[in-house]
Amino acid sequence: MELYAASHSLPNYPSSFLFKPKITTFHTTLFPTKFAPFKASFFSPNHLTLTTPMNPPTTSLSSAAFVEHNNGSTSTSLPFHPETRVGEVKRVTKETNVSVKINLDGSGVADSSTGIPFLDHMLDQLASHGLFDVHVKATGDVHIDDHHTNEDVALAIGTALLQALGDRKGINRFGDFSAPLDEALIHVSLDLSGRPHLSYNLDIPTQRVGTYDTQVVEHFLQSIVNTSGMTLHIRQLAGRNSHHIIEATFKAFARALRQATEYDPRRRGSVPSSKGVLSRS
């Protein structure tokens, strides 16, 4: 990113004052209010250039060196993550043809067409509430039932997550969220540990929601767990409506996964494990 400060907009303060900027927060004020206004242009997420009367345009600060100076104290204040984490998978069998692309650092874009309308609706929840960009295209033998397409979409999503996470350096690793939807309340807790495990406790009262077989909800989640290598616990705390129970589950899962995949700036890019490595078991 580059920040340009117009020289005519800056008062003539003593150099001793100008050399001690106090950077308070990236999203609101980068300099004391007496320095405003200034023009800002953003180009790169991990690199910035500050241009002031004392800093010619060639002066640049990397994200690792961007610190706050306040009464002699120095601390890293702005975590930058230059690499977009994307996983892309194509899975083809005699039963299905599935393409999945996931951007963990997206904005919630959903583009899903699986031939199973209710599953598309749930994938929209994953994108919207996880702020992931989720693109899923699938064709399959839905004339038989939803089972094969449901399973293979989930297997591909889990593999795409595994790709996108990479070495998992700097992430939170753990996620925990409870989502209400009217009378339904679902709690999800997960660990991107590399060890696949599903603990599933949903009591869905009807066999179908629309044409969607509710028995395959557990199978969908188990398939994601198997290929992504996550530990996933799901608990139903309340709920009577099948649609609400399932949708609250996907919303809670999306928010917990968002927490787990986001960066922890205090880790400074280290692997969140005492072993020093997180890999698919």
Swiss-Prot record:
Pfam family, one: IGPD
Transit peptide (first-last residue): 1-85
Residues that coordinate or bind Mn(2+) 1: 121, 148, 243, 247
Cross-referenced SUPFAM superfamilies: Ribosomal protein S5 domain 2-like
Positions annotated to bind substrate: 95, 121-129, 147-151, 173, 195, 243-251, 273-275
Signal sequence bounds: none
Gene Ontology molecular function, alphabetical: imidazoleglycerol-phosphate dehydratase activity; metal ion binding
Cofactor: Mn(2+)
Annotated residues for binding of Mn(2+) 2: 147, 151, 219, 244
Keyword set, alphabetical order: Amino-acid biosynthesis, Chloroplast, Histidine biosynthesis, Lyase, Manganese, Metal-binding, Plastid, Transit peptide
Family according to the record: Belongs to the imidazoleglycerol-phosphate dehydratase family.
Name recorded for this polypeptide: Imidazoleglycerol-phosphate dehydratase, chloroplastic
UniProt organism field: Pisum sativum
Chain's gene name: HIS3
